[in-house]
């Protein structure tokens, strides 16, 4: 099957719109027509070399679509089903999977084709890789069946797509990773798509105070609409000092949702005793974070967060039910729609802070 895709060939260069060939689905694979795909900062990090990815590769990892065909061993979805996909592939058999932590699967390679198998995607004999095992900036995707979950057909696919990454990560960071408790105080550094999702997760969890921190007043105003009770423009002064004053001695939870090491340090220092800082953003590979060890005697802690500690097949329907109930606002998160050919404009708007989420749509 020949489809159009945005191919990443060189760092810091525009993606190349190319025709690529998708193989027939293998026994455990699913062919999905891409209807919508959110544009995430992780795609841009990969384009700039901050996340290591083989090349050439098709970026994009926040899609929703319609199943076109399935392999003979696939039972969870069938042709015509509406699905969302997530990068949290899992084998189902390793120690992490059987203990209920599929997002930390030790053998996600089991869901890929073998070295001796024909590639899923190619162009004139050249193997084209799939970023995050998805490669969703394309008119169709060939995926392992454990990468997709069936959703109800009445949910708009451009909204549902966000659940695959931004919402899964941000809401999950609050509900699953940190397990925010009712009545607590929360700080979120960064009011982009993931940060807004953390804010919504904290609101759903019943946080008493939710402070959004960003450099753009427009994004801070948006954060209030999604549940932030207070906002801080980080350019205005000493952010840590301001947070400690606003919270009466420090926050119970602080989330770094940008991917900047200095912000993780600020998240740690703004905590109250026994507070928890959570790294949600993708800090570039190799960067070092420096913390004053004396603060650990106050029983503060720092946690990593992998995709919101998700159990994708359970959490995706759960979060979409929050959407149905009006508790999770996906509609307002979709700021713009763009065709695949406008992917570079989507990256520009994201970098400029003009959007919460741009969603690519496919005819």
Mark where each language-model region is.
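Cysteine-cluster motifs in flexible loop/terminal segments that predominantly coordinate metals
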Residues: 87-146
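C-terminal hydrophobic helical "lid"/dimerization subdomain
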Residues: 1, 249, 265-269, 273, ...
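Mid-domain Rossmann-like dinucleotide-binding core that forms the NAD(H)/NADP(H) cofactor-binding site
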Residues: 139, 146-148, 152-237, 241-242
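Glycine-rich cofactor phosphate-binding loops and adjacent beta1-alpha1 units
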Residues: 178-182, 194, 205, 215-217, ...
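Short Gly/Pro-enriched turn/cap motifs at secondary-structure boundaries
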Residues: 21-22, 54-60, 78, 128-133, ...
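Glycine-rich beta-strand-centered segment in the early N-terminal region that forms part
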Residues: 23-37, 47-98, 103, 152-154
């Amino acid at each position: 099957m020949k489809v159009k895709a945005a191919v990443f060939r060189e760092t810091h260069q525009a993606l190349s719109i190319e025709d690529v060939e998708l193989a027939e689905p293998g026994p455990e694979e699913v062919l999905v027509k891409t209807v919508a795909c959110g544009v995430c900062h992780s795609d841009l990090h990969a384009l700039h070399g901050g996340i290591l990815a083989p090349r050439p590769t098709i970026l994009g990892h926040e899609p929703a679509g319609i199943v076109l065909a399935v392999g003979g061993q696939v039972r969870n979805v069938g042709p015509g089903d509406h699905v969302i996909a997530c990068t949290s592939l899992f084998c189902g058999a390793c120690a992490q999977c059987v203990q209920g932590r599929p997002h930390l699967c030790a053998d996600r390679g089991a869901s890929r084709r073998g070295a001796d198998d024909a590639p899923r995607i190619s162009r004139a004999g050249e193997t084209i890789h799939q970023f995050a095992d998805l490669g969703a900036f394309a008119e169709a995707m060939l995926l392992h069946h454990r990468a997709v979950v069936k959703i109800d057909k009445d949910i708009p696919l451009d909204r549902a797509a966000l659940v695959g990454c931004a919402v899964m990560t941000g809401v999950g960071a609050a509900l699953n990773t940190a397990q925010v408790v009712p009545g607590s105080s929360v700080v979120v550094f960064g009011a982009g798509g993931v940060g807004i999702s953390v804010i919504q997760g904290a609101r759903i969890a019943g946080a008493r105070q939710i402070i959004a921190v960003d450099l753009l007043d427009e994004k801070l105003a948006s954060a209030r609409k999604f549940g932030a009770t207070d906002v801080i423009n980080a350019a205005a002064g000493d952010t840590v000092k301001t947070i400690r004053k606003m919270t009466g001695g420090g926050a119970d939870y602080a989330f770094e949702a940008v991917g900047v090491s200095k912000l993780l340090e600020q998240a740690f220092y703004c905590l109250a005793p026994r507070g928890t800082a959570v790294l949600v953003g993708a800090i570039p590979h190799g960067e070092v974070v420096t913390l004053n060890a004396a603060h650990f005697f106050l029983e503060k802690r720092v946690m990593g967060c992998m995709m919101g500690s998700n159990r994708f097949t359970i959490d995706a329907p759960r979060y979409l039910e929050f959407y149905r109930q009006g508790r999770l606002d996906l509609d307002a998160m979709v700021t713009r729609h763009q065709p695949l050919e406008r992917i570079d404009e989507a990256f520009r708007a994201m970098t400029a802070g003009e959007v919460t989420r741009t969603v690519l749509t496919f005819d």
